[in-house]
Structures are given as C-alpha cells and as structure tokens.
Amino acid sequence: MKQGICIQGPTEYYKELADYYSQFENVVWATWNDESIIRLDYIRNKGIEVILLEKPTIAGYMNVNMQLASSYAGVNRLFELGIDEALKVRSDTIVTNLDKLLPRLQGKKLAFMATCKVGVRKDIAYDLVYYHDSHDYPADNVVYGNIHDLRDMFNFQIEDMLPIPPEALIAWNYMTTQDMTFHLSYKNMINEGISFFLQECLEENVEVNWLKRGVNLVDWYKDKTVYEW
C-alpha cells in the first residue's frame, strides 16, 4: 500500500513547505502556471514534482474552483503514479510528525481532522439541499483518503457564484458521488463511513500549523464545545 502527499495551492510558503515535505516520498505540488520560476525551481530541486495549471475562468465563491482544480490535479497525478492513499494539504499548512501520523491513517476511506458542531457558530447561513443555520462542515486544510475517493471528491467545478462555504460544497459533492445520504451532522457522516483523525493527532503529538494564520489547528479543533471528531 503506497501513500502520497498532495500539496495544493500557491507557492507563498515554498521554502517552508518544500524543506519539510521533501523528506517524504511521493510528494507532488499542484499550483498555477503564473507562479514565480524561482519558487518553482526551488520546489523541484527539493525533489517535489510540480504540476502547473491554468487558473479556472471562474474562481468561484471563496476561490472554491481554484481549490478544486489544484486538489484534483494533485491527487490525480498521485493516482497516475500508482498511489493508493494520500494526504491532501493546503500550501500554507505543515503537518508535523507525519512519520507517525501516516501509518495511523492507513486504510481510512476518507478522513477529515474534525467537523464544525452543528448549531454552535451561527454567524453564517446557507442553502444546500437543506437550510443550514451555522458552520456545520468538515475542516479541509488537511484531508486523507483512498485515492479514488479523493479524486471523486475534487473532480467538479461550480459555474455559479453560490454563497456556500467551499468545505460544504466539497463534502456535498463527495457524498452524492458515493450515493451517501447528504447531511453534515457528525452522526450521519460517521454512519456513512467518513472518519476524523484529530484523536490520532493528539496521540502522536502532531501539529497542523496553518502558516497563514500562525495557529496550530490541532489546538483550534480540539475544543469539543465547537468541533466534533
């Protein structure tokens, strides 16, 4: 069973990510064809394969189409390389202690770190199959899964500027392509075979450092009054 890592997004933190993730095997970085040549060469010289893409004509609400395009390109390349399961990470995120975490994730069909507890953070509302009156979707900075499930999840684009959180749209697409009942409650996702791995992060002293915000997402998501896992 071969595991891989897909980094997706722009190259702002190219040195930090390339220096760290280059110690692992089967790493690709899917980014845009207008990124700095100096940055791209640095990444390549670290042994990470770079996949260059044209930006989608329609970026989508909160750049959802850009996230989808880069994520799909990365996991699809890993599929072509014969990878069975992969970790998808944003290009502003470093997951520490991966040598300990990756073996713990092996065999998971699709896994997120955590999901927003329904009805707690009520500063948004949106319509997607049913009315949602709070943040209620899984976190997507880091996602692990079977390579076929990851390809299915990211293989779509949104033509309209729908004011729906990208995380919710991506979860909806995955669940509908797998003929799952779409509801973003923790109980339903668990019942449908989706899992969460914050507990493994805690047990292995993993940090998920979101460089853009300067926070360790493990500390953020472990608050069970706000998140479930």
Predicted regions and their residues:
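Short, well-formed alpha-helical segments that are part of the catalytic scaffolds
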Residues: 11-23
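Short, polar loop motifs at secondary-structure junctions
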Residues: 10-13, 31-38, 116-119
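GT-A fold catalytic core of metal-dependent nucleotide-sugar glycosyltransferases
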Residues: 75-112
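N-proximal low-complexity "stem/linker" segments adjacent to membrane-targeting elements
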Residues: 1-12
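Short loop->beta transition adjacent to catalytic acidic/histidine clusters or analogous donor-positioning motifs
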Residues: 2-3, 22-29, 48
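Active-site-proximal specificity loops/subdomain of glycosyltransferases
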Residues: 32-80
